[in-house]
Amino acid sequence: MSREMGELTQTRLQKIWIPHSSSSSLLQRRRGSSIPQFTNSPTMVIMVGLPARGKTYISTKLTRYLNWIGTPTKVFNLGQYRREAVSYRNYEFFRPDNMEAQLIRKQCALAALKDVHKYLSREEGHVAVFDATNTTRERRSLILQFAKEHGYKVFFIESICNDPDIIAENIKQVKLGSPDYIDCDQEKVLEDFLKRIECYEINYQPLDEELDSHLSYIKIFDVGTRYMVNRVQDHVQSRTAYYLMNIHVTPRSIYLCRHGESELNLRGRIGGDSGLSARGKQYAYALANFIRSQSISSLKVWTSHMKRTIQTAEALGVPYEQWKALNEIDAGVCEEMTYEEIQEHYPEEFALRDQDKYRYRYPKGESYEDLVQRLEPVIMELERQENVLVICHQAVMRCLLAYFLDKSSDELPYLKCPLHTVLKLTPVAYGCRVESIYLNVEAVNTHRDKPENVDITREPEEALDTVPAHY
């Protein structure tokens, strides 16, 4: 093999090396050509559909999910680019015969695609969600050519809805609060937005089963009453399609809480499978009274397999379902130890966990990263359900809360989930509304903040600086 043939050049795509050729380098390709598409090439998720079809809702939820499972993902909302370029006046900006506006909109799309390239090829992103109408074949061809030039995979998500009640509700919930309509009369907003939809309908070209048979896509009809999936290419696209087939928009609330205070909580010991303390039992009855006062229709109750969650649920006097996936994080060799004992016997492990709490795995135990993977089926079922009460544990509750509140892996292990407090999560248009309800039963504090000094050579006093008081 010649020296030239043996050289490898790293492309801007993550961790991909290709043979170097001095005569026709792929890195110096001419415009319009393409680079190879590898198995782990980044993916562009392209939204398609008329306005008020839930595209931004889908984009936001999908991005939150993919980030939660560890796939770096970012939304690029074309409406934001357009608002930065020009102030909105009325629906006439979207008329197909408004050539000046058409040019502005195309320039905004190109600016967004430039940022997509920066994110996927330079900032270690793996999935870019291009949130726009993309209703014409011309616009989709532009995006496909862009993806081909940079070696990205493409997966289309088309949301189709012909139910006028669903469309009207979407306009009411989302568009009335849009930056395009600040301080506008509600009736005028509705009138203008319906005319905007009419502008798009003139040139709308849905994905076609025959003409687009070579493309990868999922079509969602009437917010999930029917799906059509075509040519799923890889793991990311498969998980995306599966996730989208599990979400719904039915109004509901999810109640998250920890078990009542346990005997090991009182003694400052982590893990184990102890029963409730006297105050923990008092909380269990307080929780039962609270749930009854809420008059929640068709409530499902989930617990872990551990004694303390089961004892808490028993006080409710209703059927409950046990999930092994909801068990507390496995602390391995550190099970039932206090933080002081861990520092004494495993000072290096204690410091390593403080350095990267999300990825650190207890010897013979689990990490938060492991726990997220274990909880993915729970998240899928929560998305499918309506009203649910989940009685779980501190680390588990942190993982679930991070999903619903879109928290990063750095934030996740330090989310505060105190004992004897219920969090009521109500999904709204682009996020989740949180209500914290303390049930007025005292309990020990089990939250430990990250200490300032996380070095392995630190003094024991520095390592234990943030340990909460216990008996």
From Swiss-Prot:
GO cellular component assignments: 6-phosphofructo-2-kinase/fructose-2,6-biphosphatase complex; cytosol
Any one GO BP annotation for this protein: negative regulation of glycolytic process through fructose-6-phosphate
Region 6-phosphofructo-2-kinase, residue ranges: 2-250
One Pfam family here: 6PF2K
Gene3D superfamilies, alphabetized: P-loop containing nucleotide triphosphate hydrolases, Phosphoglycerate mutase-like
Official protein name in the record: 6-phosphofructo-2-kinase/fructose-2,6-bisphosphatase 1
Primary role: Synthesis and degradation of fructose 2,6-bisphosphate.
UniProt entry tagged with the keyword Kinase: yes
KW Transferase (keyword) present: yes
Organism: Mus musculus (Mouse)
Record region (Fructose-2,6-bisphosphatase): 251-471
Family of the protein in this entry: In the C-terminal section; belongs to the phosphoglycerate mutase family.
Residues annotated to bind ATP: 49-57, 170-175, 350-353, 394-398, 430
Name of the gene: Pfkfb1
Entry-linked SUPFAM superfamilies: P-loop containing nucleoside triphosphate hydrolases, Phosphoglycerate mutase-like
